[in-house]
Amino acid sequence: MISSSHFAIFCIILVSLFALQQYEIGNMEENLNASKIVVYLSPCVRKRCSFSLFKNCHCCRGKYHFCSKNIKVCEKECLRLNPPRPLP
C-alpha cells in the first residue's frame, strides 16, 4: 500500500506534469505562428528584350505578358494584368 506522503508526492508530480504540458502547448502555438515566413515572389522575371542582346527587361510571369526595363513598372502592370489568386 502507498503511504500518504508517497501519495502526496505523486499528486504534486502529476499536477506539475499537467501544468508543464499546458505550458508547452501554448508555447508551441506561439512558435508556430512566429515561424510563418512570408516570401515575396515578384510577378516579373528578367528576360532578354526583343531589341537587345542583354537580359535587361522585366516581363510578367502570368497569362498576359508585359515587358518593361523598369522593375517597378513591370510589377505594377503585371499585378493589374494578372491579379494574384486568393489564398484558401
Curated annotation (Swiss-Prot):
The UniProt record lists the keyword Disulfide bond: yes
Entry keyword annotation includes Glycosyltransferase: no
Homology family: Belongs to the MEG family.
Disulfide cysteine pairs (residue numbers): 44-59, 49-78, 57-74, 60-67
Tissue-by-tissue expression: Expressed in stems.
This protein's UniProt keywords: Disulfide bond, Signal
Name of the encoding gene: ESFL11
Leader sequence segment: 1-23
Identification of the protein by name: EMBRYO SURROUNDING FACTOR 1-like protein 11
